[in-house]
From Swiss-Prot:
PROSITE patterns documented for this protein: HELICASE_ATP_BIND_1 (PS51192), HELICASE_CTER (PS51194), INTEIN_C_TER (PS50818), INTEIN_ENDONUCLEASE (PS50819), INTEIN_N_TER (PS50817), Q_MOTIF (PS51195)
Motif interval(s): Q motif: 1-29
The encoding gene: hel308
Protein name, entry field: ATP-dependent DNA helicase Hel308
Knockout-associated phenotype: Not essential, it can be disrupted. Slightly more sensitive to UV and mitomycin C than wild-type cells.
Residue ranges of every copy of the DOD-type homing endonuclease domain listed in the record: 500-640
GO biological process: DNA repair; intein-mediated protein splicing; intron homing
SMART domains the record matches: DEXDc (SM00487), HhH1 (SM00278), HintC (SM00305)
Gene Ontology MF annotations: 3'-5' DNA helicase activity; ATP binding; ATP hydrolysis activity; DNA binding; endonuclease activity
Family the entry assigns: Belongs to the helicase family. Hel308 subfamily.
PTMs per UniProt: This protein undergoes a protein self splicing that involves a post-translational excision of the intervening region (intein) followed by peptide ligation.
Keyword DNA damage: yes
Coiled coil: none
Residue interval(s) of motif DEAH box: 145-148
Length: 1125
């Protein structure tokens, strides 16, 4: 389609043609014919560099010129906002005004009301929606760039909520990379869909292996064996190359290595221009490496560089001065293997995106995608005491601790046994097998680790009141169920009620009409008395029916429709489908967990007490593997050890029952647990030995054997968000940036290391990297090459070149993001009650994709209870929400409610002892802060620092065994960085001392600045003490500028930062008054102070002062080298 044929304003055509564009690309033409120019929503999913931005510009400008109003262009990153702002400024020739906004989440930015095109990050626009900026009602179009990030764990929920808010209020144009389910996104947005793989530059894709380049069309080119030859070949052709690697250090190392080779291909003018570029970069440890690489026309690009440095590199690459950039882009199980998830154990082959699995940290993380491949050959069967055997591929890694048993004898005859531990470390299953078989020392054992989740659910009741109706043979009627009016609003959670629920899990069932039944033995009078007494206590209006049956069976029944529904929805129905909900399993109240365990044991357990010679034990049998794994975690959360045994019992010839899972507690745990649960405790026997024990926050499982087994079929793995591990009864590994085009893209790595090992990079990411190949206007063809170092080239071609990208999945259920969004809906968007909240959630992508919001509703209820309990919101007598000042301000400040709660809880301690270190550790402890990691060799130093500063902290130091211990030391390290910063420690020394890059420090300071501001704003709500408030304000100013207290007055002056302020202070200019009294020529003697700085200060202070020619500094004369340079 020709530009002249477009049904748009002629002025727009003129601007486009001035860019040299006379004809549109095919996908652009298809997009503009889709109805988007008439106001219809559109999802445009096409490759990088195929013209998505031009489509959005045409739609935006045409709509604004014809209808008025405003257009908002959403981007994921601040750097992209700046880039788009510069691009869109061109439209100001048509009278449109363009603005960009990315920071300061505590503002309505009313000044944006004067602008027509507003570029914003998603987070910034979300904050503007919360503040209720008056100009938002005028927004006629929202463009969501990179909308595929709706599947991002960290940022996806924000983007999804924005689009849900704006659906029906403004036209939506969603720009996306090619994804696996774009049609699903289009359906949700009620949008036309244009999907295309057309590119303006032909893309050749291939895999390089040991000097052979296998193209996707079957052709083979030959090069020297090292992949670097691909880079040099591109430069020799007068082209540029992008090299993607998997770590920052690799990017730096490869850039320096390539520099010495590429430098020989540069011209002398290029060398001189590179020297000028190098001289403009500030010195620090990271840029020292960058300068070494730049000498040869090569640069590295990663998040450790400052924004200014990244921009400088990108501009020099676009201009052709930099030839090469190395950059970082931002194994398997048998199908019947059970993985521990938040809702119980599930087969790895049955897991789906969004399931939450237990990771090595003891927390549950989202599954991004399940992975599957064919396998023919060996599997290793790992058998460990305390868990069921697991079948695993030999190269799959497991987390292992080496345990060494020691024995000491004393003169009085006493014998003490103790253990030493080495690790943990990752090793392949094959390596573990070889170590196990070669180990000759009987004192050495190899232990697998099962994390013990920290109880994290703070709930003391179960909500019961709800409108439920009678169900008859024709379905639901409008007749309210009679039990509802007599149902208590909540069922308290305590030892008694948890015990009752435990009994129901073991021996209970429900009917659709609300009958709750317990099946017990007819000789269990004490149990009958407990069940009936507890029902009478908490359901006083319920009719209880006790009936004996043959074979010594007894049923206890009562009716409560709401409680029955809660049991079915949260626990399940049927012996093999039941699981323990997190509300109980992870409840912070130990009494709740103890009551639950007692009820389970009473219902379906067995306590062996009669033997003195043989080991006694507590046993629980179930056909539900999910329940078995959860029971082991429940026992472990109480500080005891247990084991799981699986057996298959047969009856008759050829008849096989389902596997039975027995969870056993024996040894010392047996006696202690019986006593704590309130059972009769027998006399201790001679045998209390147990091979398993707890260590730190893990259950240690001793490996007893590893056997081989032949297998042919599919094997599975998981990609986990923010982690590289998951639990199958013990921890296994899941073995599973830059926006510039270049002629040749080389992908050195298709795996990356995160936390504890390697994982395959998703297809979508690799294909986006490949999409950078080929520069429109400059190249007729682009080349994208994957390097196969140890991988099979054919498999890489099948996966990454011919494979389809992954599907997008809603990340709204991410608890941290969802918590903040629920608060915002209530306090800022006028959601009046829970029904309205559910109604809004039903319009989200999550609801559209899953067709059901029940799990989201359950989470929302938990969050609402949390918000009420912590005084963010309240409810009136009609169950309508009331937004409280604390909640409204928290939402406006754009921080997690958990962060706000931490601040509020700390206010009394801050008033007693305001100090920088305690406040900085508080900031670092919040979920909104990016904290540093304390490496193993540093842990002792930071623990010593914590004890030294203990009286200044606002929280206690966790024990070594506590799962929070390592994270706490990271918080201490982060607080120490901030303390050094405000004490004017030079940046270079901070980078070196803490082994961080400038980009890391910038990110920490930016977040700390915002959190410090939020702390002050929230403190104002709670009758603040003026002296404490002033202290916090001064500390905030010190944090923002990185200065000691004596420089506060100076840094308030324009363009006076930490270095210039210190230079002025040391030169004797210690206050504004000193500066006003000084002569300009004296100020000009201070390092870093120039004429423009002085003039700016005078203007700021309202002083009219003209600097004479004599007072102006004389220009320094240069030499010949300066002139030539």
């Amino acid at each position: 389609m020709k530009v002249d044929e477009l049904p748009i304003d002629e002025r727009i055509k003129r601007v486009i043609k001035e860019r040299g564009i006379e004809e549109l690309y095919p996908p652009q033409a298809e997009a503009l014919k889709s109805g988007v120019l008439e106001g219809k929503n559109l999802v445009l999913a096409i490759p990088t560099a195929s013209g998505k931005t031009l489509v959005s510009e045409i739609v935006m400008v045409n709509k604004l010129l014809s209808e008025g109003g405003k257009a908002v262009y959403l981007v994921p990153l601040k750097a992209l906002a700046e880039e788009k702002y510069r691009e869109f400024k061109e439209w100001e020739v048509l009278g449109l005004r363009v603005a960009a906004t990315t920071g300061d989440y505590d503002s309505t930015d009313e000044w944006l009301g004067r602008y027509d095109i507003i570029v914003a990050t998603a987070e910034k626009f979300d904050s503007l929606l919360r503040h209720g900026a008056s100009w938002i009602k005028d927004v006629k179009l929202v463009v969501a760039d990179e909308v595929h990030l709706i599947g991002s764990y960290d940022r996806g929920a924000t983007l999804e909520m924005i689009l849900t808010h704006m659906l029906g209020k403004a036209q939506i144009l969603a720009l996306s990379a090619t994804v696996g389910n774009a049609e699903e996104l289009a359906e949700w947005l009620d949008a036309s869909l244009v999907v295309s793989d057309w590119r303006p530059v032909e893309l050749r894709k291939g895999v390089f292996h040991l000097g052979q380049l296998f193209w996707e069309d079957g052709k083979i080119d030959h090069y020297p064996e090292n992949w670097e030859s691909l880079v040099l070949d591109a430069v020799k052709k007068g082209k540029q190359a992008l090299v993607f690697v998997n770590t920052r250090r690799s990017a730096e190392k490869e850039a320096i290595s390539l520099s010495s080779k590429v430098s020989k291909l540069l011209t002398k003018p290029e060398t001189r221009r590179l020297e000028e570029l190098i001289s403009s970069i500030e010195d620090n440890p990271t840029t020292e490496k960058l300068k070494r690489a730049l000498k040869g026309g090569v640069a590295f690009h990663h998040a450790g560089l400052s924004r200014a440095e990244r921009t400088l590199i990108e501009d020099a690459f676009r201009n052709g001065l930099i030839k090469v950039i190395t950059a970082t882009p931002t194994l398997c199980m048998h199908p019947d293997t059970y993985v521990v998830t938040k809702s119980g154990a599930k087969k790895v082959s049955e897991l789906t995106e969004g399931d939450e699995v237990l990771t090595h940290t003891g927390t549950f993380k989202k599954v991004i995608q399940p992975l599957r491949r064919e396998h023919k050959g060996r599997l290793l069967v790992i058998k460990a005491y305390g868990t069921v055997p697991v079948k695993i591929t030999p190269e799959h890694m497991v987390w292992v601790v080496k345990q060494i048993r020691h024995k000491s004898h004393y003169s009085d005859g006493r014998q003490v046994i103790w253990w030493e531990f080495e690790g943990p470390e990752w090793m392949t299953a094959q390596e573990l097998k070889e170590r196990l078989e070669s180990e000759t020392d009987p004192k050495v054992s190899y232990m697998l680790l099962q994390p013990i989740p920290e109880p994290s659910v703070d709930a003391d009741k179960i909500p019961l009141r709800k409108e439920v109706y009678v169900v008859n043979q024709h379905g639901k009627t409008d007749k309210l169920h009679p039990s509802v009016k007599r149902t208590p609003e909540y069922l308290p959670l305590n030892f008694e009620t948890a015990r009752l629920i435990g009994l129901w899990i073991a021996e209970g069932s429900t009917s659709k009409n609300g009958v709750i039944k317990f099946d017990i033995s007819s000789n269990e009078e004490d149990l009958t008395e407990f069940i009936t007494g507890t029902i009478r206590k908490y359901f006083p209006h319920a009719k209880i029916v006790v009936k004996d049956h043959e074979r010594n069976r007894r049923t206890v029944r009562f009716c409560n429709k709401r409680f029955a529904e809660w049991l079915r929805e949260n626990i399940g129905h049927g012996a093999d489908n039941k699981s323990i909900p997190p509300l109980l399993l992870l409840n912070k109240n130990r009494e709740v967990r103890l009551g639950l365990l007692r009820g389970l044991i009473e219902g379906d357990g067995y306590v062996r007490r009669e033997s003195q010679r043989r080991a006694n034990y507590i046993s629980y049998s179930t056909v539900s593997p999910s329940l078995a794994y959860q029971l082991q975690l429940l026992v472990a959360s109480l500080g005891y050890t247990s084991s799981i045994h699986r057996s298959i019992r047969t009856e008759g010839i050829g008849k096989t029952r389902k596997p039975i899972y027995d969870v056993k507690v024996s040894g010392k745990s047996y006696y202690s647990l019986l006593e704590e649960l309130g059972f009769e405790v027998p006399q201790r026997g001679n045998r209390t030995y147990n091979v398993n024990r707890t260590w730190k926050n893990y259950l240690l499982l001793k490996v007893r054997s590893i056997e081989e087994e032949e297998y042919e079929g599919d094997v599975y793995n998981l990609e986990v968000e923010g982690d590289e591990s998951y639990s199958v009864g013990f921890i296994v590994h899941n073995s599973a940036g830059i926006n510039l085009p270049a002629f040749r893209v080389i992908i050195r790595d298709t795996k990356r290391y995160a936390n504890f090992g390697w994982t395959d990079i998703p297809v979508l990411e690799i294909q986006q990297m490949m999409g950078r190949a080929g520069r429109p206007k400059y190249d007729k063809v682009g080349e994208a090459i994957i390097v196969a170092r140890t991988e099979d080239p054919k498999k890489l071609i099948d996966r990454y070149i011919h494979g389809k990208p992954e599907k997008l999945f809603s990340m709204l259920a991410n608890e941290q993001a969802f918590r903040s969004q629920v608060l915002a809906l209530i306090t800022n968007f006028g959601v009046e009650d829970f029904r309205e909240l559910v109604d809004f959630l039903s319009r989200t992508f999550y609801a559209h994709q899953r067709g059901d919001t029940s799990s989201l509703e359950y989470k929302a209820k938990d969050i609402v209870y949390f918000l009420i309990e912590n005084e963010f919101i309240d409810m009136d007598v009609e169950n309508r929400f009331i937004a409280l000042p604390f909640g409204r301000r928290t939402s406006q400040l754009y921080i997690d409610p958990l962060t706000a709660k931490k601040f509020k809880d700390a206010f009394p301690a801050i008033e007693r002892n305001p100090n920088p270190f305690g406040i900085f550790q508080l900031l670092a402890s919040t979920p909104d802060m990016a904290t540093l990691t304390a490496r193993r060799r540093e842990m002792e130093d930071y623990l010593d620092l914590a004890y030294e500063m203990e009286e200044h902290l606002y929280s206690s130091i966790p024990y070594y065994e506590d799962s929070r211990f390592q994270g706490f030391l990271g918080q201490v390290k982060t607080a120490k960085v901030l303390l050094d910063w405000i004490n004017e420690v030079p940046e270079a020394r901070i980078y070196e001392t803490y082994n961080i890059d400038p980009g890391d420090l910038y990110r920490i300071l930016e977040l700390a600045d915002w959190l410090m501001y939020s702390l002050i704003e929230l403190y104002k709500l709670f009758e603040p003490k003026e002296d404490v408030l002033q202290y916090l304000r001064d500390l905030h100013l010190r944090l923002r500028h990185g200065v000691r207290e004596e420089l506060l007055e100076l840094v308030k002056l324009p363009n006076i930062g930490r270095r210039r302020a210190r230079a002025l202070y040391n030169a004797g200019f210690r206050s504004v008054e000193d500066i006003l009294r000084a002569k300009p020529k004296d100020l000009l003697q201070v390092e870093g102070i120039g004429l423009k700085i002085i003039e700016g200060i005078y203007r700021h202070l309202g002083v009219e002062y003209t600097i004479s020619e004599k007072e102006k500094p004389k220009k320094r004369k240069g030499n010949l080298y300066d002139f030539l340079k």
